[in-house]
A protein has these predicted regions:
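Conserved cytochrome P450 K-helix/beta-meander segment immediately N-terminal to the heme-binding cysteine loop
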Residues: 66, 78-80, 96-123
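An acidic site on a long C-lobe helix of protein kinase domains
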Residues: 51-54, 128, 145
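Conserved cytochrome P450 K-helix E-x-x-R motif and the immediately C-terminal K′/meander segment
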Residues: 43-84, 105
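Hydrophobic, well-ordered secondary-structure elements that form the walls
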Residues: 30, 62, 88-91, 114, ...
């Protein structure tokens, strides 16, 4: 479980950075939020993460577009039932395709577009997000994963200005596997923010 959590957390952080590099106005907005809520005299802490609404929206939108586990864990039907008009006998193994649900144009406006704002202020669209599953059988590590990604991504945004390594748009091709890694490694350029340099020098 620890290994699975580590891989999915790092994968989500990498996808988030790739998306932010292709949309440079988004990390600027997140930087402004962090500066206002946390300041520049200390690093972001785990207690800060839940208070940073736009950072949370970036993470949610990343998980919508690139869920670390695009197919949720298999479940078995405990009784005969109907799902979407289909007969499902008792004992059937069921998989939920979170990737397809998160990109369904019937459920999401402009589903292929990276738009963290869709999760702001409790908008209805946000209730359809399920990267960790739903109900009593959803991933028990959800809270830890969200807190960890928030802390890592928040610190990267707070402390550095980021740019694309070669100046061209980051390739968003998806790799294969159980977890949805990137097809090509992410390369980026970073520069310490002047406002955070004194904090970084003390680390």
């Amino acid at each position: 479980m620890v290994g699975a959590g580590t891989e999915t957390t790092s994968t989500t952080t990498e996808w988030a950075m790739a998306l932010l590099l292709n949309h440079p106005e988004k990390p600027k907005k997140a930087q402004a939020e962090i500066d206002a809520a946390v300041g520049t005299s200390s690093l972001i802490t785990p207690d800060d993460v839940p208070r940073l609404g736009y950072l949370q929206s970036i993470i949610n939108e990343t998980l919508r577009l690139y869920p670390a586990a695009p197919l949720l864990l298999p479940h078995q039907s405990s009784a005969d039932c109907k799902v979407g008009g289909y007969d499902v006998p008792r004992g059937t193994i069921l998989l939920v395709n979170a990737y397809a649900i998160h990109r369904d144009p019937a459920a999401w406006e402009d589903p292929a577009e990276f738009r963290p704002e869709r999760f702001e202020d409790g908008k209805a669209e946000g209730r359809l997000l399920m990267p960790f599953g739903m109900g009593r059988r959803k991933c028990p590590g959800e809270a830890l994963a969200l807190r960890t990604v928030g802390l890592v991504l928040g610190a990267l945004i707070q402390c550095f200005d980021w740019g694309r390594a070669d100046g061209v748009e980051v390739d968003m091709a998806e790799g294969g596997g159980v977890t949805m890694a990137r097809a090509v490694p992410l390369e980026a350029m970073c520069r310490p923010r002047a406002a955070m340099r004194h904090v970084l020098e003390e680390l």
